[in-house]
């Protein structure tokens, strides 16, 4: 897999947990965003942004922390221009220090918790949008942004306000207050005190425009979609792996599945149907297409016209001779 690594382009690191019941060395309790105490294994992936596909993976013991695995993997693949993306649970000053003192040119973009102290409370309480550095649009959504320099290590905090997200958060808060869904007692008008709704922030050692940071991290959301695909759609589940060799085989099959899934994402994004269907939609649409045999004749069952049009648009020919 190392031969697939681009030498002068950016790649991204990300990891996910798979819970397993196997009694073997790779299965161990460790950190995961769900804070589950079940034994797990960690799957660390390297993704290429220009080619937009998974390039490299490692199966790790569940107790191995990502910061150590990131550094070891950097050395293993010989990466010279890499960006680490992680979830909200990863950021801490010790983790940042480990990456920055590794002696490697590691760049990172980490999301911050909504209650982070790196953004002053007064910033949220100020309701005047002139406090922002600027604004851009993404998918017909208005995104305001502010960039802060923090500390003396060349790190920056990028803070955003998504007005559409803010409206959704406010609606959700009021609905919970009206129906007493929360353990704490709130009145609907307490929504006026929730100054952080619609805000989200990242910390990064990249000194670039806030829009670039936003777009780079959005690629992780595409990766999350693929991890969801692995966990929910691919039947090779590590839950019932009996030993490390069996688990390694499952990881390889998952990798092959992920390559096809990313190929589907790329083909769909380049077609006229990229706003109409998701990769999961296409998989559901085509799962009943079968090859049937009558006597000595083999044929593909009838395909609905709309599905055939979509398949043709993304370059899939299910009627080809193999």
Can you say where each PLM-predicted feature lies in the sequence?
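Anion-binding and metal-coordination hotspots
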Residues: 1-322
């Amino acid at each position: 897999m190392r031969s697939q690594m681009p030498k002068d382009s950016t790649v991204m690191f990300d990891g996910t947990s798979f819970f397993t019941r196997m009694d073997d060395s790779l299965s161990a309790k460790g950190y995961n965003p769900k804070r589950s105490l079940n034994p797990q294994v960690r799957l660390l992936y390297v993704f290429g942004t220009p080619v937009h596909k998974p390039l490299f993976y490692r199966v790790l013991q569940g107790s191995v922390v990502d910061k150590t695995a990131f550094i070891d993997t950097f050395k293993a693949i010989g990466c010279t221009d890499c960006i680490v993306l992680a979830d909200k649970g990863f950021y801490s000053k010790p983790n940042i220090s480990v990456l920055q003192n590794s002696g490697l040119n590691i760049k990172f973009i980490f999301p911050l918790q909504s209650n982070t102290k790196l953004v002053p409370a007064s910033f949220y309480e100020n309701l005047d949008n002139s406090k922002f550095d600027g604004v851009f649009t993404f998918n017909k959504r208005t995104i305001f942004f502010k960039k802060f320099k923090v500390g003396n290590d060349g790190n920056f905090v990028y803070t955003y306000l998504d007005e559409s997200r803010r409206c959704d958060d406010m609606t959700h808060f009021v609905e919970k207050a009206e129906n007493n869904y929360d353990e704490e007692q709130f009145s609907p008008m307490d929504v006026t005190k929730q100054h952080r709704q619609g805000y989200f922030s990242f910390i990064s050692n990249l000194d670039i425009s806030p829009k670039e940071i936003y777009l780079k991290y959005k690629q992780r959301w595409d990766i999350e979609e693929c991890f969801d695909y692995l966990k929910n759609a691919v039947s090779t589940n590590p839950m019932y792996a009996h030993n490390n060799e069996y688990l390694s085989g499952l990881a390889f099959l998952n990798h092959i599945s992920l390559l096809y899934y990313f190929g589907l994402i790329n083909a769909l994004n380049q077609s006229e149907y990229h706003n109409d269907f998701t990769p999961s939609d296409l998989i559901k649409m085509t799962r009943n297409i079968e090859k049937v045999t009558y006597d000595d004749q083999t044929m593909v069952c009838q395909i609905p016209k709309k599905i055939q049009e979509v398949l043709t648009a993304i370059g899939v020919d299910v009627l080809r001779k193999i």
